[in-house]
């Protein structure tokens, strides 16, 4: 009893960690055998007590946490609010995903933390509780899924599914939850199988690399070492890692404290000695590692250190290589199995929050913060430095310090309540997480037209790319609408939101019904239409009997009508308007059908002075063959053509074009073929061939002549010069000139022959060699530049307003410079001369300040016949940013940003409705083909039509009869609407004006039978200055919604609607949903304001998408998008899951040296830098030796640290020496380079570094090489044993190469002997005589080389030391002997 009283009694819970410590102490005190007996007693005790207390596990023991209900309800409420914010466009998809995942993760984690206290209070002897929290079986995550909630799951690709599983396994899963659960569990099961096989294959490759590494000697005699220091410049090494690195190593140098030696060289380090060294505060300790051993085919006992099994120095003959490979590969398999039961459940981290301790007012320095968005899309302030936040209450002042890079979630002087979150601290950068960049694609939910916000300056990455980067946070809008899917429409050239008259154009139209909508004051009728295919024909279109209001937008270019030229539409040149016509000189046969006048209008519609308005490519100046242009430039007038590529980018200058005052130019034809570099050319340079000669496998020559082959970058130019070859003598004058044109009649005269040329010729001197030359006389095509078609007469005289005084000048210019080659691609022709029309105006009059001309197209549809009009007028200034544009009343137009660009003229049942335009001025027919009718139609600001003058008698009579019948019609003369800009509010009322004009469709520039009915416009016009013009105070018009693309705001009870909202609502403005625009008003749906009437607003439905800086927008402005099209790509970073399933591929990438991160890139850069610098400093022989050595040391340390970082982040502890043995093998080769090569090695050959050094010394000449990093697979296939290589992979290839090269396998490794059935050269009793012999051999060599060793004890030692992180290495050039 007395002995029992002296025993120490420990009253504490024994968990897994405590058991480990207990077993460790028992082994230290009693030894292995006695400890095993004690542990058997503990095991028996446990079974007996479990049986005595009758612990069993039943389904009733799974108790759900009571607080789960309201926690889940609170998370659902937050998710609903988040969904609303996303719908309103306040957060984008990535922020929504992040926040949703964190909401549910926080809920799940809170439930998990509640489990333990709940069990302790309600049922402390619950079997689940005791089993899980004692560590006997099951962990907290598994119990949490049983009694808490399963939470968020991963899909097979590893992405989070933002729909959580709210049930636990006790409650049972719904069908949806079960399917999602299968996703995650499938990921766990599949990952387990796949990663287990991956880890097994990794182990096989590792063992393959190092299977021949066996402990052969006690001491290799190296003087090198690696210095380990607990304190480094960059960071502090933890004491635990420092001790782990030192224990079991052997010292490379003596350690002195002052003058006293406390440890000797070649002494192994135990825990006692290491603790003493730490206590003494030793700065750096030099230790021996496998890196410092002097051979790559074996290792010595002292460089390896203690054996991890029994704690003494490793025995001779120990196969440490295989142990190292299995030590690295095995944890991958082991840790993969750990994730099996968890089944893909998401585990992540949330940010730390700072909460207010009590109610009060916030105070902080606003100069130290910067406004930003959190990763959840909330507004916040970012702190750059430590920020002091003061919370003032009535009697207490509390100060909180917010660390840098944190988010402050409150404003200055804001009142906060107790426990309110005021700041969010980001996760510390010291934690090791695998970050990966993920692309999140956002797809369009509906069909429509793309807009981005008006205040976003937008610049594309590439000029012609449809991917654009957003510079700041903004909204993208998809304006609702549909595409017309009928293939029977005659001219499908509607673009950029043209008004389409679907009932007229659609061949599937069934009927026209009439709707009636009752309002308080009046009853209106609306037209609607039924379609067979409603999904496809939902075009944004509306129509009303009383007239409607469309506003023109200048940013839209309308295509003209084509007959046979529909293929030109495929070029997507939306700013080009082609006027097809036949030859004026009645030469239809000679003209190509695609010829015509091209009018190119910049996207913003602005022409500068002296800019090209239209051009015409004359078919007479077209060539199909390549050649060279020659002409004499007498005088050049510069015509600068400017265009705005994108309206926000300002004016971009294009290439200067020159009008050449020449009457003729010359074209020297030649056949040119541009071939890839690898083409097999079947003709020789400077050879002469005939017609239809095979040049390559697929190309034959079109003409015969002299071959010229020119090799350029990655391509070959093959030219064929036709002509006569002349070998001149010394007296021949023609031989003195090269590259000249000789006019006809001139000839060459000499003693032998005389010849005169009928046409112009081109003389070219060819010099195949330095001594020989000959002259090639080539034919020349001569072109006379005559007066071409007078393009100005094709435009009507009243195209411009009379007071603007705009003129059109005609120029001809040559498209290619003098002596420049022209190249034709495939079968396309080359245009040599272009005729252009240049806009000019007089600057001497009162409008001298005018700088630009404004031009745009208008498309009018009448009875299915589409007509194009152009309008041109001067403007005083041009500002590229639209929202800031101010226009004077006399500028000729009013631009409205983002306005509905419809110009609806909608014919239905013989009635064509006219809608007023906001643009003042004149819109007129663009081109008249028939000279008898100068202008057919003019639409002016006063809404009056001027018909005529018609020279044809029949047309003239019809108009006169119409005027007689309707005497109240106002018809102005030609000077009226052209010269006046009437006020917007001055509208004319017309009685019906009937005009009959019988013209066929074939001529397509004249009007068919139609009838105009003008009605009084009953709408408000709001211009950009906020002025409201009441067009008709007595009407109350509501437009009919068509296909649910429009929303209407009725105002029946609020009389001051326009007064209150005139400063808020403007035409073209975008509204997010739930925005209140007036008092007592319903909240609007999201969309764009199209029409503001007296008591109603027409809004086009739109869906907003928020995009943040750096997001990539796909598509162009105002492009039509279909449902499912990619809209935006977000690129964001996320943390990978924290299990070994993600860490194992990382280890594999590092060991295979194909890492996707910066390891291999940095090492490659360092390798090149060291090779260059060291070679330059020390000269070539020293440079290659030291450069390669330092690079290898550097890369070895970097790789070891990287691999250890991965394993330590997973909680796996592997001794450094195992990794060092592997890394030593993959970094011990050098690549022989080509420069200064000796005859021993081939360029590109992989050899060992030691072999390269010894060969260099033996040959007494420099061998140029550089260090390379081999992956473990390549290292396995580059060993000294071809039997080992063949047993790994690619057996046939390896054996065939070995047979051809006559390789000899000395059977030094383990695997070769296993394959051949021999005794493996390993084991503690294997062949000691061989080891003894080699030791004597080494000693002799070392005695011979003592002079070389002394070299490194002097000044050179400082150069050879290289410091990197916590390691230091010195390199010796002593002789390295090998077995």
Curated annotation (Swiss-Prot):
It is found in: Plastid, Chloroplast. GO terms for biological process: DNA-templated transcription. Its EC number is 2.7.7.6. GO terms for cellular component: chloroplast; DNA-directed RNA polymerase complex; mitochondrion. CDD domains: RNAP_beta'_C. Its cofactor is Zn(2+). InterPro entries: DNA-dir_RpoC2_beta_pp, RNA_pol_beta''_euk, RNA_pol_Rpb1_3_sf, RNA_pol_Rpb1_4, RNA_pol_Rpb1_5, Rpb1_funnel_sf. One of its GO terms (molecular function) is DNA-directed RNA polymerase activity. The keyword Zinc applies. Pfam families: RNA_pol_Rpb1_4, RNA_pol_Rpb1_5. Binds 1 Zn(2+) ion per subunit. Keywords: Chloroplast, DNA-directed RNA polymerase, Metal-binding, Nucleotidyltransferase, Plastid, Transcription, Transferase, Zinc. It comes from the Eukaryota. Zn(2+) binds at residues 220, 293, 300, 303. The keyword Repressor does not apply. It catalyses: RNA(n) + a ribonucleoside 5'-triphosphate = RNA(n+1) + diphosphate. DNA-dependent RNA polymerase catalyzes the transcription of DNA into RNA using the four ribonucleoside triphosphates as substrates. In plastids the minimal PEP RNA polymerase catalytic core is composed of four subunits: alpha, beta, beta', and beta''. When a (nuclear-encoded) sigma factor is associated with the core the holoenzyme is formed, which can initiate transcription. Belongs to the RNA polymerase beta' chain family. RpoC2 subfamily. This is DNA-directed RNA polymerase subunit beta''. The gene is rpoC2.
């Amino acid at each position: 009893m007395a002995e029992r009283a002296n025993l120490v009694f420990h009253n504490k819970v024994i968990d897994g960690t405590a058991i480990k410590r207990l077993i460790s102490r028992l082994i230290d005190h009693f030894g292995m055998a006695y400890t095993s007996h004690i542990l058997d007693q503990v095991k028996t005790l446990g079974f007996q007590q479990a049986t005595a207390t009758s612990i069993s596990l039943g389904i009733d023991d799974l108790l759900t946490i009571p607080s789960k209900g309201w926690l889940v309800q609170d998370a659902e409420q937050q998710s609903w609010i988040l969904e609303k914010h996303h719908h309103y466009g306040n957060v984008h998809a990535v922020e929504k995903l992040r926040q949703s995942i964190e909401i549910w993760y926080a809920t799940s984690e809170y439930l998990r933390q509640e489990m333990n206290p709940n069990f302790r209070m309600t049922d402390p002897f619950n079997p689940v509780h005791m089993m899980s929290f004692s560590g006997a079986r099951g962990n907290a995550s598994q119990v949490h899924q049983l009694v808490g909630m399963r939470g968020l799951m991963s899909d097979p690709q590893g992405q989070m599914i933002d729909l959580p599983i709210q049930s636990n396994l006790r409650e049972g899963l719904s069908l949806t939850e079960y399917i999602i659960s299968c996703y995650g569990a499938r990921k766990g099961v599949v990952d387990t199988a796949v990663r287990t096989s991956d880890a097994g294959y990794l182990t096989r490759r590792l063992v393959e690399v190092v299977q021949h590494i066996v402990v052969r000697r006690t001491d290799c005699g190296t003087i090198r070492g690696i210095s380990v220091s607990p304190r480094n410049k960059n960071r502090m090494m933890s004491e635990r890692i420092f001790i782990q690195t030192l224990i079991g190593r052997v010292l490379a140098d003596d350690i002195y404290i002052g003058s006293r030696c406390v440890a000797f060289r070649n002494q192994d380090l135990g825990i006692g000695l290491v603790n003493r060294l730490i206590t003494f505060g030793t700065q750096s300790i030099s230790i021996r590692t496998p890196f410092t051993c002097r051979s790559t085919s074996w290792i010595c006992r002292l460089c390896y250190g203690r054996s991890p099994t029994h704690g003494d120095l490793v025995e001779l003959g120990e196969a440490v290589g295989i142990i190292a490979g299995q030590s690295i590969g095995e944890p991958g398999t082991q840790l993969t199995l750990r994730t099996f039961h968890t089944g893909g459940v998401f585990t992540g981290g949330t940010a730390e929050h700072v909460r207010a301790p009590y109610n009060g007012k916030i105070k902080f320095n606003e100069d130290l913060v910067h406004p930003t968005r959190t990763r959840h899309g909330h507004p916040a302030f970012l702190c750059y430095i430590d920020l002091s936040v003061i919370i003032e209450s009535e009697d207490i002042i509390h100060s909180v310090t917010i660390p840098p890079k944190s988010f402050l979630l409150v404003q200055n002087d804001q009142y906060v309540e107790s426990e309110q979150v005021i700041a969010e601290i980001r996760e510390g950068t010291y934690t090791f997480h695998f970050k990966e960049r993920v692309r999140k694609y956002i797809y369009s939910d509906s069909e429509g037209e793309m807009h981005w916000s008006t205040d976003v300056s937008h610049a594309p990455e590439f000029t012609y790319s449809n991917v654009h980067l957003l510079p700041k946070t903004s909204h993208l809008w998809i304006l609702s609408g549909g595409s017309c899917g009928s293939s029977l429409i005659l001219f499908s050239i509607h673009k950029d939101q043209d008004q389409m008259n679907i009932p007229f154009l659609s061949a599937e139209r069934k009927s026209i019904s009439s709707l009636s909508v009752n309002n308080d004051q009046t009853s209106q009728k609306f037209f609607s239409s039924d379609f067979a295919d409603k999904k496809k024909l939902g075009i944004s279109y509306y129509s009303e009997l009383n007239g409607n209001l469309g506003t023109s937008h200048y940013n839209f270019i309308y295509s003209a009508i084509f007959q046979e030229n529909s293929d030109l539409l495929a070029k997507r040149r939306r700013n080009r308007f082609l006027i097809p016509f036949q030859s004026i000189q009645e030469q239809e046969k000679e003209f190509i059908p695609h010829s015509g006048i091209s009018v190119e209008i910049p996207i913003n519609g602005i022409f500068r002075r002296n800019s090209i308005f239209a051009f015409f490519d004359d078919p007479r100046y077209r060539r199909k063959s390549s050649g060279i242009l020659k002409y004499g430039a007498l005088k050049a007038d510069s015509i600068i053509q400017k265009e705005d590529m994108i309206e926000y980018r300002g004016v971009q200058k294009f290439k200067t074009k020159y009008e050449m005052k020449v009457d003729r130019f010359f074209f020297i034809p030649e056949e040119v073929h541009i071939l890839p570099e690898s083409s097999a050319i079947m003709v020789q340079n400077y050879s002469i061939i005939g017609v239809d000669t095979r040049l390559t496998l697929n190309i034959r020559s079109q003409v015969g002549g002299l071959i010229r082959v020119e090799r350029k970058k990655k391509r070959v130019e093959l030219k064929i010069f036709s002509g006569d070859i002349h070998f001149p003598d010394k007296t021949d004058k023609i031989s003195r000139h090269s590259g000249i044109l000789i006019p006809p009649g001139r000839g060459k005269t000499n003693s032998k022959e005389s010849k005169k040329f009928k046409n112009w010729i081109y003389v070219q001197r060819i010099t195949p060699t330095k001594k020989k030359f000959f002259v090639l006389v080539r034919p020349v095509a001569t072109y006379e530049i005559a007066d071409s078609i007078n393009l100005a007469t094709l435009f009507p005289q009243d195209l411009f307003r009379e007071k603007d005084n705009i003129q059109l000048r005609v120029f001809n210019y040559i498209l290619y410079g003098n002596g420049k080659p022209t190249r034709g691609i495939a079968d396309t022709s080359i245009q040599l001369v272009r005729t252009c029309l240049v806009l000019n105006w007089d600057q001497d009059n009162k409008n001298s300040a005018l700088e630009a001309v404004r031009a745009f197209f208008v498309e009018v549809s009448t009875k299915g016949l589409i007509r194009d009009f152009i309008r041109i007028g001067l403007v005083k200034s041009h500002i590229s940013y639209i929202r800031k544009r101010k226009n004077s009343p006399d500028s000729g137009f009013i631009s409205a940003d983002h306005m509905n660009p419809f110009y609806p003229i909608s014919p239905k049942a013989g009635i064509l409705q006219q809608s007023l335009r906001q643009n003042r001025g004149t819109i007129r027919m663009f081109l008249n083909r028939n000279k008898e009718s100068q202008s057919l139609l003019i639409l002016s600001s006063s809404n009056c039509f001027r018909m005529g003058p018609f020279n044809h008698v029949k047309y003239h009579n019809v108009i006169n009869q119409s005027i007689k019948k309707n005497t109240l019609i106002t018809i102005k003369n030609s000077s009226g609407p052209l010269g006046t800009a009437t006020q917007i509010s001055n509208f004319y009322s017309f009685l019906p004006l009937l005009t009959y004009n019988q013209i066929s469709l074939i001529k397509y520039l004249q009007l068919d039978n139609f009838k105009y009915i003008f009605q009084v416009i009953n709408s408000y016009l709001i211009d950009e200055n906020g002025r409201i013009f009441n067009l008709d105070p007595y009407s109350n018009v509501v437009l009919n919604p068509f296909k649910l693309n429009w929303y209407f705001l009725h105002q029946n009870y609020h009389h001051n609607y326009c007064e209150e909202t005139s400063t808020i609502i403007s035409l073209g403005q975008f509204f997010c949903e739930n925005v209140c625009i007036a008092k007592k008003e319903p909240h609007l749906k999201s969309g764009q304001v199209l029409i503001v009437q007296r008591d109603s607003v027409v809004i086009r439905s739109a869906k907003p998408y928020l995009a943040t800086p750096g997001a990539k927008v796909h598509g162009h402005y105002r492009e039509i998008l279909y449902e499912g099209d990619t809209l935006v790509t977000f690129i964001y970073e996320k943390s990978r899951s924290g299990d070994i399933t993600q860490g194992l591929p990382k280890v594999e990438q590092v060991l295979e040296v194909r890492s996707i991160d910066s390891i291999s890139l940095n090492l490659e850069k360092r390798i090149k830098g060291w090779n260059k610098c060291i070679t330059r400093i020390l000269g070539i022989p020293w440079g290659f030796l030291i450069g390669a050595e330092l690079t290898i040391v550097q890369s070895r340390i970097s790789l070891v640290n990287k691999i250890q970082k991965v394993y330590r982040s997973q909680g796996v502890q592997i001794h450094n020496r195992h990794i060092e043995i592997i890394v030593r093998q993959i970094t011990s080769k050098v690549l022989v380079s080509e420069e200064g090569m000796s005859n021993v090695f081939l360029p590109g050959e992989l050899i060992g570094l030691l072999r390269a050094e010894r060969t260099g010394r033996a040959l007494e000449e420099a061998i140029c090489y550089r260090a390379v990093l081999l992956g473990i697979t390549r290292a396995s296939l580059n060993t000294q044993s071809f039997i080992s290589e063949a047993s790994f992979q690619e057996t046939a290839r390896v054996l065939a190469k070995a047979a051809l090269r006559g390789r000899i396998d000395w059977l030094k490794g383990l695997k070769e002997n296993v394959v051949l059935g021999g005794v493996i050269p390993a084991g503690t009793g294997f062949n000691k005589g061989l080891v003894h012999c080699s030791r004597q051999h080494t000693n002799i060599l070392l005695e011979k080389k003592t002079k070389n060793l002394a070299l490194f004890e002097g000044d050179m030692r400082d150069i050879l030391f290289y410091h990197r992180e916590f390691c230091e290495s010195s390199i010796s050039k002593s002789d390295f002997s090998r077995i």
